[in-house]
Regions:
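Catalytic Walker B motif of ABC-type/P-loop ATPase nucleotide-binding domains
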Residues: 148-152
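ABC ATPase NBD coupling module
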Residues: 61-79
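Conserved ABC ATPase "signature" region
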Residues: 62-64, 104-119, 170-171
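Hydrophobic anchor residue at the start of the ABC signature
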Residues: 137
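Conserved H-loop
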Residues: 177-183
Length: 211
């Protein structure tokens, strides 16, 4: 389980978060610029908190008091950023295996499950938007992450594609049983995918009590 208690001061917003990430899909909503992306980038190791700590099970990833910092490449995190999500001139296979932290068997399994087997040697830039989203998810899952972080995974898609891709992503995430933070500003999307709903407003992450 990921546990965290940290503050990160950014020019645009100061993010404060204190809690733990349980299994299932946790949706994080909030307005643009509220600090959602900064929060998951701290978990991923792409942004350093100003104060506080982050732990994964018995391993400490961040402890600012002890000046401890585990870099992103040493954390078992699957991160799917917003925006350009594939390397368009690389094949689908090379996109998925880009981190080199998985195995050929894992790649084969992902290609099969994601419906991308026939595109193994196709340049990712030639695929549709929905297919590219599946490539990006495959890359995030390739290293068998302990946590999956998705930053606005449907925002680049037109409305006609969103429902099908959303259902595909949710199905695969649940099948792989990996804890997930799904960031979105779309409330209807949040209601469709999440086991629980966190909010971010002016940098404050609000985590409702469960049970």
């Amino acid at each position: 389980m990921i546990t965290f208690s940290f503050t990160v001061a950014r020019p645009s917003v100061t993010v404060k978060a204190d809690g733990a990430l349980p299994s299932g899909i946790t949706v994080l909503t909030g307005q643009s610029g509220s600090g959602k992306s900064t929060f998951i980038k701290c978990i991923a190791g792409l942004v350093k908190p100003t104060t506080g700590s982050i732990q994964c099970d018995e391993t400490t990833w961040v402890d600012r008091d002890k000046k401890l910092w585990v870099p992103a490449q040493e954390r078992q995190v699957g991160y799917m950023p917003q925006g350009n999500i594939v390397f368009p001139h690389l094949s689908v296979e090379r996109n998925i295996t880009y981190s080199k932290r998985g195995t050929p068997d894992m790649c084969n399994t992902l290609l099969q499950r994601l419906g991308l087997k026939k595109y193994r040697h196709t340049k990712a830039g030639r695929l549709s938007g929905g297919e590219q989203q599946r490539v990006a998810l495959g890359r995030a899952l390739y290293s068998k992450p302990t946590i999956l972080l998705l930053d606005e995974p449907l925002s680049a898609l037109d409305w006609n594609l969103r429902k099908q891709v959303r259902e595909d992503l949710v199905s695969i995430i649940r099948e792989w049983d990996v804890p997930c933070v799904w960031v979105t500003h779309d409330e209807s999307e949040a209601e469709s995918v999440g086991d629980r709903h966190w909010t971010c407003e002016n940098g404050i992450i609000t985590i409702p009590k469960e049970g």
